[in-house]
Design a protein with these regions (language model features):
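Bacterial N-terminal signal peptides that target proteins for export
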Residues: 1-7
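GH16 jelly-roll
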Residues: 19-345
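Hydrophobic h-region of N-terminal signal peptides that target proteins for export
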Residues: 12-19
């Protein structure tokens, strides 16, 4: 969710909007995955032993236009689905999450935004190092709509963003607007979702790498439910849509640096930063630096309220080696190998 812009990495044999494009090959689920956590949203209310709301109006660090609230108008469970609802309404609330600041003066700061929405997280309720994460969801459409399923470090061991990393399982912006995908036929609508890692040093020394997945227009992710998944092991991270393994990122393509008290930087060794506990986040942002600068540009205020629907969230760990997560991989040879950034010497 901290993306400012995307360098598009083309998929080998990627999907196009043409109906004659062969169906992508699904990968058989690797053996050894053991279900360790789930929310099927089968209760009448959001399970607050599993999820907590973020409450702030700071715009996500991306100039987004929403206040995140804990109100039932913005998030609720009904008919077996989690509803995350963005509404166009002027709203004033706290600038920061209460756990992000240390002084009363900072906690009392407020801001006003033209939209409300919700951002849910499992921080300190459920955190994981390595595993398979599956989320079945239907996404909102429109210029400025930015749904995301992602992960942040719980302990920030290597320092502030992005020294400690960020894992984006799925993001989409501006679905069903006119696409600016240069590989799509003229006049096509936006269908892409994106998987991304953020790493490197503390902003502005952060970097990111990722890959898009292109749906056919007949199967737009704003019209249908799809399963978005990520497999994370010690030396590799893999992305999936509906069991299609579409991208892989190897550990020799990422790095992490931490800033010292004297201002110098050191490179963190091993598999940093993706060797620590992370937690899940689900949210629906409106506007921001990424969606407002692509497709039709700006934010379309029409059509609200809009919602992101989540059918289930399931987390698996590799029973063959829970310490490294290695041994249960679901792989497809045609998946693109993401090229990362190297540590600047």
């Amino acid at each position: 969710m901290s993306v400012k812009s995307y360098a598009v990495i083309l998929l080998t044999g990627a999907l196009s909007a043409c109906q004659q494009t062969p169906a992508p090959v699904k990968a058989s689920l690797g053996e050894g995955w053991q279900l360790v956590w789930q929310d099927e949203f089968s209760q009448n209310d959001l399970d607050l032993t599993k999820w907590q709301h973020e409450v702030n109006c700071r715009g996500g660090g991306n100039d987004e236009l929403q206040c995140y609230t804990a109100r039932s108008e913005n998030s609720f469970v009904k008919d077996g689905l989690l509803h995350i609802v963005a509404r166009q309404e002027q709203y004033t609330g706290p600038l920061h999450n209460s756990d992000e600041v240390s002084s009363d003066a900072e906690r009392e700061k407020q801001a006003t935004q033209p939209f409300t929405s919700a951002r849910l997280r499992t921080k300190n309720l459920a955190d994981w190092r390595y595993g398979r994460f599956e989320i079945r969801a239907k996404l909102p459409a429109g210029q400025g709509a930015w749904p995301a399923i992602w992960m942040l470090p719980t302990d920030w061991r290597y320092g502030r963003w992005a020294s400690s990393g960020e894992i984006d399982i799925m993001e989409a912006v501006n679905l069903k607007t006119l696409t600016d995908d240069k590989t799509a036929p003229a006049g096509s609508l936006e269908t892409r979702v994106h998987g991304t890692l953020h790493y490197g040093g503390p902003a502005p020394k952060n970097v990111y790498s990722g890959s898009p997945y292109r749906f056919s227009e007949a199967n737009n992710p704003a019209d249908n439910f799809h399963v978005y998944a990520l497999e994370w092991q010690q030396d590799e991270i893999r992305w999936y849509v509906d069991d299609v393994h579409y991208a892989t990122f190897r550990h020799d393509q990422w790095y992490s640096t931490s800033q010292q008290q004297d201002g110098s930087f050191i490179e963190n060794t091993g598999f940093a930063p993706f060797d620590q506990r992370f937690h899940l986040l689900l949210n629906f942002a409106v506007g921001g630096n990424w969606p407002a600068n692509v497709n039709d540009k700006g934010v379309d205020f029409a059509g609200y309220p809009k919602q992101m629907l989540v059918d289930y969230v399931r987390v698996f760990q590799c029973s063959k080696n829970s310490e490294t997560g290695i041994g249960c991989a679901t792989k497809q040879p045609s998946a693109v190998q993401i090229k990362g950034k190297t540590y600047p010497q």
